[in-house]
Regions:
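A short acidic, often aromatic-flanked loop/helix-cap motif at beta-alpha or helix-coil junctions
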Residues: 1-2, 15, 138-140, 151-152
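Acidic metal-coordinating catalytic centers involved in nucleic-acid phosphodiester chemistry
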Residues: 1-28, 32
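Hydrophobic transmembrane alpha-helix bundles
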Residues: 3, 93-107, 162-179
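Compositionally biased, intrinsically disordered low-complexity segments
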Residues: 10, 31-32, 53, 189-191
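Polyanion-binding interface signature
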Residues: 28-148
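Ampiphathic alpha-helical segments that act as solvent-exposed interaction surfaces
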Residues: 114-126, 149-190
Length: 191
């Protein structure tokens, strides 16, 4: 087996070769020393208070506790319409989502259409691409806003990431759920 040689350069006043020059704010990316579940728990523990505050306290995420899961579900008051956040460690993505499933495919599509009619309004409030998935071949429908290339081990980015979730979830709820709540309830109730 080949023997590995470890070389360490100590800044002792000698010139550092130009090819090894240090950058003042060089960022070193290292593998996380914690488990995926611990990382998820730490991220949600950090993010949840910011999300709760964005909703004004006693609201959508106020009764939610951090957990070592990939998703964090909020309560919007309409059965079958769900607002949730997702962190995917392996895919390096973070998203705010609406999932529609009232156990009736036709109603789900009508609920999606009510929200989709507000597409122009939500796009004014969310500066990211919005994924509209009516899912005609499935029972459920989704709306999601996702950012990619997220390194969850880089805790210096957590404030930016939690702010993304907070502002995006508030906008999704305000523009696609609260603003059309009466229409959504009419579809669900079958009137």
């Amino acid at each position: 087996m080949e023997e590995l040689l470890h070389i360490s350069f100590v800044n002792d006043g000698r010139d550092i070769p130009s090819e090894l020059d240090e950058e003042e704010d060089a960022e070193i990316v290292v593998a996380s020393d914690i488990s995926d579940n611990d990382l998820k728990l730490q991220f949600w523990t950090n993010a949840l208070p910011v999300i709760v505050d964005a909703f004004g306290g006693n609201s959508t995420y106020s009764n939610v506790s951090p957990a070592p899961r990939s998703t964090l579900d909020g309560f919007v008051g309409i059965s079958g319409v769900n607002l949730y956040c997702t962190m995917r460690l392996r895919k390096h993505t973070l998203s705010a989502n609406i999932w529609i499933d009232v156990k009736d495919k036709e109603k789900n599509k009508r609920l999606f259409d009510v929200m989709y009619a507000r597409k122009d309004n939500i796009e004014k409030h969310v500066p990211y691409n919005i994924g509209w998935n009516r899912g005609d071949d499935k029972r459920s429908s989704t709306v999601n806003v996702e950012i990619e290339d997220v390194d969850f081990n880089d805790t210096s980015r957590w404030p930016e990431l939690t702010q993304f979730l907070a502002t995006t979830c508030v906008a999704l709820k305000a523009e696609l759920i609260t603003a059309c709540e009466d229409e959504l309830r009419v579809v669900i109730d079958g009137n």
